[in-house]
């Protein structure tokens, strides 16, 4: 996707803020369900980073695999656990929390300085799918990826939503 530079920068900043907010939600929220949903936000933002880089199939695959499978599995596992054990013995701040905050803050600052010093416009990300087809360099796996991300995208997404609804219904019936 060839976006103008200001829109590209805004999109990257917006997705980066989504990553930061979601990561803070995973770490700071005491309810494990809310933490799992924050993890879902992080995984969605990570997969959306591939769209400006013309890697639409990678974005869709990561969205389906990580958000559609891994995060749903985490939510179901948390739903089956006893929720009362998370609220006992809640300490406001410990030494381990301080050390972890210091390490994470230093890693965050080093990443921010590295990202701001990198020239992102000189990087060649990927080729477009129509150029790959024209070069006749594709194998069966690449053809499948191209068709799933173009021709069969809507049916593929609808099947995944139907499977998700069936899983949620099965879990709800099993809990009763």
From Swiss-Prot:
Enzyme class: translocase
Membrane topology summary: Multi-pass membrane protein
GO cellular component terms given for this protein: chloroplast thylakoid membrane
InterPro entries listed in its UniProt record: NAD(P)H-Q_Oxidoreduct_6, NADH_UbQ/plastoQ_OxRdtase_su6, Nuo/plastoQ_OxRdtase_6_NuoJ
TM ranges: 10-30, 33-53, 61-81, 92-112, 152-172
Protein EC: 7.1.1.-
Domain of life: Eukaryota
Localization, UniProt: Plastid, Chloroplast thylakoid membrane
Principal subcellular localization: plastid
Keywords: Chloroplast, Membrane, NAD, NADP, Plastid, Plastoquinone, Quinone, Thylakoid, Translocase, Transmembrane, Transmembrane helix, Transport
Keyword DNA damage annotated: no
GO molecular function: NADH dehydrogenase (ubiquinone) activity; quinone binding
Reaction equation(s) it catalyzes: a plastoquinone + NADH + (n+1) H(+)(in) = a plastoquinol + NAD(+) + n H(+)(out); a plastoquinone + NADPH + (n+1) H(+)(in) = a plastoquinol + NADP(+) + n H(+)(out)
Family named by the database record: Belongs to the complex I subunit 6 family.
Complex and partners: NDH is composed of at least 16 different subunits, 5 of which are encoded in the nucleus.
Known role: NDH shuttles electrons from NAD(P)H:plastoquinone, via FMN and iron-sulfur (Fe-S) centers, to quinones in the photosynthetic chain and possibly in a chloroplast respiratory chain. The immediate electron acceptor for the enzyme in this species is believed to be plastoquinone. Couples the redox reaction to proton translocation, and thus conserves the redox energy in a proton gradient.
Protein's UniProt name: NAD(P)H-quinone oxidoreductase subunit 6, chloroplastic
Gene that produces this protein: ndhG
């Amino acid at each position: 996707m060839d976006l103008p530079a200001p829109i590209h920068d805004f999109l990257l900043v917006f997705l980066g803020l989504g990553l930061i907010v979601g990561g803070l939600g995973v770490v700071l929220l005491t309810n494990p369900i809310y933490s799992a949903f924050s993890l879902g936000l992080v995984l969605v933002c990570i997969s959306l980073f591939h769209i400006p880089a013309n890697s639409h199939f990678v974005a869709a695959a990561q969205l389906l695999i990580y958000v559609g499978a891994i995060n749903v599995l985490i939510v179901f596992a948390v739903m089956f656990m006893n929720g009362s054990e998370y609220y006992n013995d809640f300490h406001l701040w410990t030494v381990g929390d301080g050390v972890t905050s210091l390490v994470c803050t230093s890693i965050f600052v080093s990443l921010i300085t590295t990202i701001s010093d990198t020239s992102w416009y000189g990087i060649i990300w990927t080729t477009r799918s129509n150029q790959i087809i024209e070069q006749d360099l594709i194998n069966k796996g690449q053809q499948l990826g191209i068709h799933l991300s173009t021709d069969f995208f809507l049916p593929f997404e609808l099947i995944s939503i139907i499977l998700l609804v069936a899983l949620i219904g099965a879990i709800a019936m099993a809990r009763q």
